[in-house]
């Protein structure tokens, strides 16, 4: 956050944040409302939600949704972390892919026909057409997402300028703490769910407000969310589904339904299920996203009806600082998408899917807490934060 402000000299910071389920295809550790508080306490001025129909997708769709929201909010610059750290290299890579598009697409098909996943085939295709050091490594996850952000800016004819910050010390998929002060989200999650894990062990790697809110959520609700807590419900869902039922679920294709129904029979945990399910053809993340859609009963027809090829259909405002509120007031008439401060009255397929995902997310809570949280999520107004007093209003 500090590097972003320094690099962009921004007046305000806007964060587009996933809701209950993440792009990796797993439940968020804590609710979006607690994560909104974390963002506001650490310098963000506006927090808006990336709808489920974008948030649980491949990088290209994820980026398109995020950029369409930021474009509607009339931001001038975006800033993303990357393994490369040089924005010029992203522009070079985009230019080369555009010039070599026919060759690139043929290579992707060739590598997929050899049994590789789409992600691996794409990475290998890039390695064939990119020969200069002034290009990015498209096997790295943050480079991939940054590349898609920039492609989305171009495809949407946006005036947004892009900046990138190099990630140091910790890589996206690192499962252990490799540095005294910097850790990946993956390693922090793994530590929290390990037998020896505690909030004390992650304190050196997180802002104090973030650690406090994590501990507060665990104290108030008794849990931190991960896939294992949903496994019983997930397995029940699959045990009551036929291959035909499963084929209707979004991202279930190429006969994957038969493999899923076969492997669930003898799986006693989500991890053991995933270990049995994974193949060269499908990445772990891709399979987790498919599992998320099974869990939330998100069908191919749901996604088609949401019409996500264009742009986000609305902006759900989750939180704002005093500066953020002033910015919205000044620019509200220029913002073309509807801004939702609650979801009681707005009607859209994407929002129906969002509500369903929230219901599933809170399903592991005990009653009456579960019903209370679901009701609050619909009626919850944006969290307000006074950055001068550092108090929530």
Curated annotation (Swiss-Prot):
EC class (word)? ligase
Q: What is its main location?
A: cytoplasm
GO molecular function per UniProt: ATP binding; ligase activity, forming carbon-nitrogen bonds; tRNA binding
Q: At which positions is ATP bound? A: 81, 142, 167
GO biological process annotation, one example: tRNA modification
Q: For this UniProt entry, what's an example GO CC term?
A: cytoplasm
According to its UniProt record, which reaction does this protein catalyse?
A: cytidine(34) in elongator tRNA(Met) + acetate + ATP = N(4)-acetylcytidine(34) in elongator tRNA(Met) + AMP + diphosphate
What is the protein's known function?
Catalyzes the formation of N(4)-acetylcytidine (ac(4)C) at the wobble position of elongator tRNA(Met), using acetate and ATP as substrates. First activates an acetate ion to form acetyladenylate (Ac-AMP) and then transfers the acetyl group to tRNA to form ac(4)C34.
Q: What is this protein called?
A: tRNA(Met) cytidine acetate ligase
From what organism does this protein derive?
Bacillus cereus (strain ATCC 14579 / DSM 31 / CCUG 7414 / JCM 2152 / NBRC 15305 / NCIMB 9373 / NCTC 2599 / NRRL B-3711)
């Amino acid at each position: 956050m500090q590097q972003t402000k320094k690099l962009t000299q921004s007046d305000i910071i806007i964060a587009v944040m996933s809701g209950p389920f993440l792009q990796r295809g797993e439940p968020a550790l804590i609710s979006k409302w607690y994560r909104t508080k974390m963002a506001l306490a650490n310098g963000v001025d506006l927090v808006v939600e990336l709808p489920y129909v974008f948030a649980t997708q491949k990088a290209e769709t994820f980026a398109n949704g995020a950029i369409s929201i930021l474009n509607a909010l009339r931001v001038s610059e975006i800033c993303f972390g990357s393994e490369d750290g040089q924005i010029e290299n992203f522009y070079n890579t985009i230019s080369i892919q555009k010039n070599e598009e026919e060759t690139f697409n043929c290579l992707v098909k060739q590598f997929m026909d050899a049994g590789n996943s789409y992600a691996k085939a794409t990475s290998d295709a890039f390695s064939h057409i990119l020969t200069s050091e002034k290009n990015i490594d498209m096997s790295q996850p943050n480079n991939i997402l940054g590349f898609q952000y920039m492609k989305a800016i171009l495809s949407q004819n946006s005036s947004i300028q892009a900046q990138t910050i190099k990630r140091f010390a910790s890589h996206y998929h690192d499962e252990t703490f490799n540095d005294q002060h910097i850790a990946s989200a993956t390693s922090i999650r793994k530590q929290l769910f390990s037998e020896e894990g505690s909030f004390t062990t992650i304190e050196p790697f997180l802002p104090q407000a973030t650690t406090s809110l994590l501990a507060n959520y665990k104290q108030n609700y008794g849990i931190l969310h991960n896939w294992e807590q949903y496994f019983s419900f997930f397995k029940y869902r699959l045990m009551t589904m036929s291959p035909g039922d499963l084929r209707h679920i979004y991202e279930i294709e190429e006969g994957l339904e038969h493999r899923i129904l076969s492997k669930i029979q003898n799986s006693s945990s989500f991890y053991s299920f995933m270990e049995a399910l994974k193949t060269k053809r499908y990445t772990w993340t891709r399979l987790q996203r498919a599992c998320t859609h099974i869990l939330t009963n998100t069908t191919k027809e749901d996604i088609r009806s949401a019409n996500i090829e264009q742009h986000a259909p609305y902006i759900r405002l989750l939180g704002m600082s005093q500066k953020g509120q002033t910015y919205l007031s000044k620019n509200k008439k220029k913002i073309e998408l509807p801004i939702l401060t609650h979801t009681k009255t707005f009607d859209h397929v994407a929002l129906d899917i969002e509500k369903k995902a929230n219901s599933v997310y809170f399903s592991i809570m005990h009653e009456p807490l579960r019903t209370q949280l679901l009701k609050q999520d619909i009626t919850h107004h944006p969290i307000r934060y006074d950055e001068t007093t550092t108090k929530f209003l």
